[in-house]
UniProtKB/Swiss-Prot annotation:
A GO biological process held by the record: sporulation resulting in formation of a cellular spore
Name of the molecule in the record: Polar tube protein 2
Acidic residues: bias regions: 255-265
Region (Disordered): 237-277
Keyword check for Lipid biosynthesis: no
Alphabetized Pfam families for the sequence: PTP2
Compartments in which it is found: Spore polar tube
Signal peptide: 1-18
Sites carrying sugar chains: N134
Biased composition (Basic and acidic residues): 237-251
Entry function: Involved in formation of a polar tube through which the infectious agent is passed on to the host cell.
Length: 277
């Protein structure tokens, strides 16, 4: 009995009792009051709105500066164009070699080759016309070759009263050829198909011209293309009659080996100095 008690005591003494786990006190949670939370959110929102407002003001300022720069550029261009026009006017009329009529404008367009330029502008789209405010620009590709200022120099465009068309004429298909000129006779628009003017139709103008533009004065028919349908029709008819006569003449002279008038026709340069294609 004593032995059993002794063994029990030894076993009890050698048993390892697990140490009790003492829970650590948790850190207190810092809860932000609802009113303070709203203040933080409002602060972030205010900063975002402030940034957006600064960006908006910067954009407005940028647009304002850009608009002012563009306006100043147009004003300088207008002044330059007026100066160029006045300089050309002071030179007076000039005659081209061979006695051809030249009526200069700001862009120095030769009226005798105007139809060829129109043909390019309308059909080949080599030239394009852009209207911005009171300025008209003529481009060849992306290159600005003329700046026309639509100001009143005291010259008035030639206007003729429209004749009342008969019912028969009204039903006939009308040619869709139109040219638009400003008050100093410069081409500012075109639509339709135009023939190239034959340079033989361009002869010296009779009598001195007061200005280099002859929107108000007479010149010969070959150099009098001012955009009126009557003059254009006459020029087309003259060319068609001449082509018919030349065709009959060439048909009778084929045996002699002579070419047609079209083969001998010299191609004229355009206003920017390049030949017609």
């Amino acid at each position: 009995m004593l032995l059993l008690l002794a063994i029990t005591a030894v076993v009890s003494a050698t048993m390892v009792h697990p140490s009790a786990v003492v829970p650590q006190p948790a850190a207190p949670l810092h809860v932000v009051p609802p009113q303070q939370q709203m203040g933080m959110v409002n602060g972030c929102t205010s900063k975002k709105l402030e940034g957006a407002e600064i960006m908006r003001r910067n954009m407005i300022e940028c647009q304002k500066r850009s608009s002012e720069a563009t306006k100043a550029m147009i004003e300088r261009a207008n002044e330059k164009a007026v100066e160029s026009f006045n300089k050309e006017v002071s030179k007076g009329p000039s005659q081209k070699d061979g006695g051809q009529c030249i009526e200069k404008a700001v862009q120095g367009t030769d009226r005798c080759i105007l139809a060829g330029i129109i043909d390019k502008a309308v059909n080949k789209r080599k030239y394009r016309i852009s209207d911005v405010e009171n300025s008209t620009s003529l481009y060849r590709g992306d290159k600005l070759i003329a700046l026309i200022v639509n100001v009143d120099y005291g010259l008035q465009p030639i206007t003729k009263p429209k004749k009342k068309k008969s019912k028969i004429m009204a039903n006939l298909p009308q040619p869709k050829r139109e040219m638009y000129f400003n008050q100093i006779g410069q081409l500012v628009g075109a639509r339709g198909t135009f023939p190239q003017e034959n340079k033989e139709d361009c002869k010296p103008c009779e009598g001195p011209k007061k200005t280099v533009e002859t929107t108000s004065e007479k010149c010969n028919l070959g150099c009098e293309l001012k955009g009126t349908s009557a003059l254009i029709s006459k020029a087309i008819q003259k060319k068609e009659v001449k082509d018919t006569k030349e065709g009959e003449k060439s048909a009778s002279q084929d045996s002699d080996g002579e070419g047609t008038a079209e083969d001998a026709e010299v191609q004229q340069p355009s206003a920017d100095g390049e030949g017609l294609e």
